[in-house]
């Protein structure tokens, strides 16, 4: 058995052991017959060994063909077409006599796909295992099939599972045919890919343009909304300012009317006094009434000139001018209120009774800035000097109608003693040092003045 196994391992692929005893030489024929008759179990073992060897070769070739033909339907078809000879091997196993006869006639069965052809008629046929120039038959090239054509072919054959497309023979895949087909497939695929890429680029460009347009439209709408909102706010503010200006203008007009009425009340009695020639009274130049009249007339002239020059000016400039004028009027009114109590005694002094004309001369002489009127009694035209009085507090000399006011102010200034701030007492407040300073007294608390430096 070990010898048979070694022999089978060294045999070539397409060669099988002969079983025809007639081809053996004559002297060994008797021995062979006795051997066949005596040991049938050895023949059965030999047949089993041969069958196992053929099966192993078949399985190896199936694996190689599975790698070459990837399409499942082609794979099954090639298996069906190329490996139909196991039936023959089974027949040979079942009928060893016919096998021996076939071998006797010169027919041999090989393990390849051409095993069922007779050897004599197979001279023109090139075996599959023989190599040709430029093509490796052990590893042929895989067919290039486009996936679309594959999908259509599969879709067309799904209905009928028994009908398979005839796969191309291995010899059909030559280098020239493969190159032509490959170029055609690449050209078709390139055109399709270029078209799809162009469509995608156009779609992406249109989409980006649409997105940019939408963004610009949204930004424009937001800007318009913001402008509308600001316009509404500005209109509201403008209405408020106009109402405020109207209110200020009405207030100013009312204040002006009130001031005019007060002025008429003040001026009418003075004009009546002036109209009375018998009771002539000389009004001092610097009296508060004269100043007020002068300021009022000046303001009126300014208002007239301003109104003529600013007729076409804006409302804001006009309102500013009105506000300044109102402030000025209030300031004048406050000054008048302050001067009223001072002017009353001076008026009384300037208006003595009419029975004594000498008193009128005396009162008129008290004003240093006013010229003296001639005496009504026809006395001499000599001008009397104004009478001066001395202040009891400071010793200065003043006119009699000013002396009283100065004396009041001077007495207040002299009588008020300013309290000097003592930082040492402020620091000692609330401590035992304060008690000590109070016990010691203010005389001792006074610090001696620093000595004058005479280093020069």
Swiss-Prot record:
Where is the sequence biased in composition, kind Polar residues?
35-46, 90-102
User: Where, by residue number, does Zn(2+) bind?
Assistant: 391, 394, 406, 410
Keyword check for Metal-binding, yes or no: yes
Which cofactors does this gene product need?
Zn(2+)
Regions of compositional bias (Low complexity) in chain numbering: 368-382
Keywords, in A-Z order: Coiled coil, Metal-binding, Zinc, Zinc-finger
Identify the taxonomic lineage of the organism of origin. Eukaryota, Metazoa, Chordata, Craniata, Vertebrata
Q: What is this protein called?
A: Zinc finger C2HC domain-containing protein 1C
**Gene3D superfamilies per record:** Classic Zinc Finger (3.30.160.60)
| Residue runs in coiled coils | 211-265
Q: Does the keyword Metal-binding apply?
A: yes
Q: Which InterPro entries match?
A: Znf_C2HC_C3H, ZNF_C2HC_dom_1C
- List residue spans of C2HC/C3H-type Zn fingers: 387-416
